[in-house]
Curated annotation (Swiss-Prot):
Region (Disordered), start-end ranges: 81-124
Entry protein name: Small ribosomal subunit protein bS16
Keyword Ribosomal protein belongs to the record: yes
InterPro entries: Ribosomal_bS16 (IPR000307), Ribosomal_bS16_dom_sf (IPR023803)
Any one biological process term the GO annotation gives: translation
Length: 124
């Protein structure tokens, strides 16, 4: 049985509240779970206690092979329970082909304009 440590949504409409649960991956998001190991209240201010974790039980479930989801892994990394690997995608921040062509054309136009301006100043 593959286990995930994930968020289960509670609360009312437009007032979310999430329980951090250990559940089978085949269970629905808000459905059956094995154990509730924490809570996250995103409506609280940033400096308040937004995330509550039962660290002892989370360590137990991680030892049993449970995999945290990305959002829960961020919480565990902030609490120092599990290290979140750094993403390595160096090409994501680069512009696409069309944007690179536009940049090259603008650079060429600027160089041509600078050369023309220098030629005009040299002839005078």
């Amino acid at each position: 049985m593959a286990l995930k440590i994930r968020l289960s949504r509670g609360g009312s409409k437009k007032r979310p509240y999430y329980h951090i649960v250990v559940a089978d991956v085949r269970s629905p998001r808000d459905g059956r779970f094995l154990e509730r190991v924490g809570a996250w209240d995103p409506m609280l201010p940033k400096d308040g206690p937004r995330v509550k974790l039962n660290e002892e039980r989370i360590q137990y479930w991680l030892g049993q092979g449970a995999q945290p989801t990305d959002r829960v892994l961020r919480f565990l990394d902030a609490a120092g329970l599990k290290k979140r690997p750094a993403r390595n995608n160096p090409h994501k921040g680069e512009p696409g082909k069309k944007a690179q062509e536009r940049i090259a054309a603008a650079k060429q136009a600027a160089e041509d304009a600078a050369a023309a301006a220098e030629a005009d100043s040299a002839s005078e």
